[in-house]
Amino acid sequence: MLTEFHFDEFYLGSDELDSENAIFIHKKIIDLWKDFGCLVYPNIKKSDYIDWVNGLDPKISKLWLVAFSHYKKTPMASNYMPVSDFQTPLDIEETYSSDELDLIIIPNNSSLINEISCTTHNLEISKTNGIIDSTSFANSKSLCEQDIAEGDSIDDILDKRFKKLIKNSKVITIIDRYWAKNHVEDISRRKPALLKILDFIYSLKQKIAITIYTSNVDSADDYKEILSNYVNLTLKRTVNFSSFILSFEISICDDSLFREQGHDRYIAFDDKVCTLGRGIAIFRDYPVPNCTFSIKDINHTQFNSILTKLSKNRKAVI
């Protein structure tokens, strides 16, 4: 799960971010952004943010420039006003409601709230001193590390663990040894897991590219005929698929390769990798079973090396 957070273009000029020990605060915010966050910012003010960054100590400025270049961020949908112009937390929540913000960070000397932090309905507002104890980031960390329990609601899993990852990603890459086998089994019997995921993407009106790597286990023709027919005669004929799925590709690899390279099952959302013990079978039309679960930065996983190996050894591409 991601925490969608915001600070206005004046925040980086705060007194506490210009002190001798400020590098600790800067690093903490940047690390939380990297691991669990997505910055929501007004596109019209992007240059103002960079101007403030360039005015910082060079060592700190370099860290922020990396963050703005590589970490997850998304333009603000609401009509923008600087946080410093608001009188109450409720005013902020109402103005920024369409952005579904989780957290706003404000300077320590802000009069917007009297406490170090407060939560108004679903929006947490935290002064700099409270960022270490942010409930939003703590919740994101917990959901990134907590396994899925038997009987959990699949709709809750999608909403709490995947919604903001999907909202803030351009490419989903799935590595799941048994996806093709399960999908073919489900086509005529129940709603396939893939359709559950696609319907959720459609509900978010998110345009995204999807790539799936799976094995040819129990298939004489590498599932080419049945999957080609499904993609071309079922998926591509729907309005939602045409509207929101920018590209869709299925790669079939020999099952022996998965035994060696891809035993674990992954869903990558750009540079965030979800490891799912049961793969996307968790979304099949069955009661939810116990399932190991984690989300990590792609550089802390073997995802890229496994993907490279699979990409070089495809038996069929659909």
Give the label of every model feature segment.
Residues 179-180:
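Short acidic, Gly/Ser-rich segments with clustered Asp/Glu that frequently serve as metal-coordination loops
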Residues 158-165:
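Short amphipathic alpha-helices and their capping/turn segments at secondary-structure boundaries
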Residues 165-171:
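Secondary-structure "cap/kink" motif recognition
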Residues 1-154, 184, 191-318:
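PLD/PLD-like phosphodiesterase catalytic module centered on the HKD motif
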